[in-house]
């Protein structure tokens, strides 16, 4: 089993955004985040810190229109960088879950580093469709962010909001729970020397 840090990088430039991401799965939670969207920066910082990922995200987007393009395109690039960092999947734990509270909110994230991209979100209260945090982050985009992340990193991801009222608390618990579940799923398992699949491939 290799002991070299697993580092992934990806970039994306379009007429709507210019994004660079680097992630070290074997980091300590050192982050360098700048998307021009303060609440999104806060969420990505939480993602890096609670995943113990060294994470750099630099994004310039058409935020004068809205946050959607920058958030979704960042998810594309973060997913691609995550896929790059995971590599051949030899020796990883593969499956993991995390239940994470934030005050009145409780969120669960379940991850399979499967090579089969799939996403499910369930349980968010109806007001998450219309809530806006900090005047710029519409919480309806949570679903788009995590779905895009799952598709581009080729993982299976389920996010369940068991309960909660405050859109900030629900959103932050989602980001932290996904980070914690990913952290555990990509950990190296000392008892697993090959690819964790009966098929021999993921």
From Swiss-Prot:
It holds the Pfam family IGPD. Pathway: Amino-acid biosynthesis; L-histidine biosynthesis; L-histidine from 5-phospho-alpha-D-ribose 1-diphosphate: step 6/9. GO terms for biological process: L-histidine biosynthetic process. Belongs to the imidazoleglycerol-phosphate dehydratase family. It catalyses: D-erythro-1-(imidazol-4-yl)glycerol 3-phosphate = 3-(imidazol-4-yl)-2-oxopropyl phosphate + H2O. CDD domains: IGPD. It is found in: Cytoplasm. One of its GO terms (cellular component) is cytoplasm. The keyword Lyase applies. Keywords: Amino-acid biosynthesis, Cytoplasm, Histidine biosynthesis, Lyase. It is an enzyme of class 4 (lyase). This is Imidazoleglycerol-phosphate dehydratase. InterPro entries: IGPD_sf, ImidazoleglycerolP_deHydtase, ImidazoleglycerP_deHydtase_CS, Ribosomal_Su5_D2-typ_SF. GO terms for molecular function: imidazoleglycerol-phosphate dehydratase activity. Its EC number is 4.2.1.19. It comes from Corynebacterium efficiens (strain DSM 44549 / YS-314 / AJ 12310 / JCM 11189 / NBRC 100395). Its main location: cytoplasm.
């Amino acid at each position: 089993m290799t002991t070299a840090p697993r580092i992934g990088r990806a970039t994306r430039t379009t007429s709507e955004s210019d994004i660079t991401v680097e992630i070290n799965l074997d980091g300590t939670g050192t982050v360098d985040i700048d998307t021009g969207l303060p609440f999104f920066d806060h969420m990505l910082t939480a993602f890096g810190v609670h995943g113990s990922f060294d994470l750099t995200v630099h994004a310039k987007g058409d935020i004068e229109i809205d946050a959607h393009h920058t958030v979704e395109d960042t998810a594309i690039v973060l997913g691609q960088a995550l896929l790059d960092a995971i590599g051949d999947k030899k020796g990883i734990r593969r499956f993991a879950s995390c239940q994470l509270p934030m005050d009145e909110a409780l969120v669960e994230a379940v991850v399979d580093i499967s090579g089969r991209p799939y996403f499910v979100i369930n349980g968010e209260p109806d007001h998450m469709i219309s809530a806006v945090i900090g005047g710029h982050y519409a919480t309806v985009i949570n679903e788009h962010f995590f779905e895009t992340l799952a598709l581009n990193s080729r993982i299976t991801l389920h996010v369940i909001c068991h309960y909660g009222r405050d859109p900030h608390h629900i959103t932050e618990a989602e980001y932290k729970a996904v980070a914690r579940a990913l952290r555990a799923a990509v950990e190296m398992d000392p008892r697993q020397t090959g690819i964790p699949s009966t098929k021999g491939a993921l």
